[in-house]
């Protein structure tokens, strides 16, 4: 027997996770299915912007701007900073931490709003008068079925 939800959102990017949270706030039982996995093997909600686009690029940009200020602009303020070096591996590590903090924040919002998160790839399996059955394949290739009265495709 598959788990039944009022709404199933396929995709945990900026459109999907917000749709899932809002549906839950409106009193619906909601599941969100997303297959993205971070470097640590854990779910990486938030879509392209959060994981490989806007957020990581802005984190790296901020680090490089601090480097530029230390090298070129501190002296204007009477601050002497000699032999300033860039540690790219630390910059990357900081960027990864910022991304993880965003991923974890979305998972927290799901928990707070009672959205069931399912880590896997969803595919339509069948339909009947009461909704749609989705087959969700996890990274370990196990498959579970869930049913939703309404499906939001946000991929």
Q: Residue ranges of each PLM-predicted region?
A:
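N-terminal glycine-/charge-rich "phosphate-binding" loop or analogous flexible N-terminal tail
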Residues: 13-19, 23
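Glycine-rich flavin
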Residues: 2-5, 21-28, 32-155
């Amino acid at each position: 027997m598959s788990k039944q939800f009022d709404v199933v959102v396929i995709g945990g990017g900026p459109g999907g996770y917000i749709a899932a949270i809002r549906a839950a706030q409106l009193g619906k039982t909601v599941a969100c299915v997303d297959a993205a996995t971070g470097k640590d093997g854990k779910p990486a909600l938030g879509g392209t912007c959060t994981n490989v686009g806007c957020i990581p690029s802005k984190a790296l940009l901020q680090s490089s701007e601090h480097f530029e200020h230390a090298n070129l602009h501190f002296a204007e303020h009477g601050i002497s900073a000699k032999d300033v070096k860039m540690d790219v591996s630390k910059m990357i590590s900081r960027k990864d931490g910022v991304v993880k903090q965003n991923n974890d924040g979305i998972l927290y919002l799901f928990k707070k709003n009672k959205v069931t998160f399912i880590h896997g790839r969803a595919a339509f399996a069948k339909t009947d008068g009461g909704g749609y059955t989705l087959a969700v394949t996890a990274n370990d290739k196990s498959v579970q079925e869930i049913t939703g009265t309404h499906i939001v495709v946000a991929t």
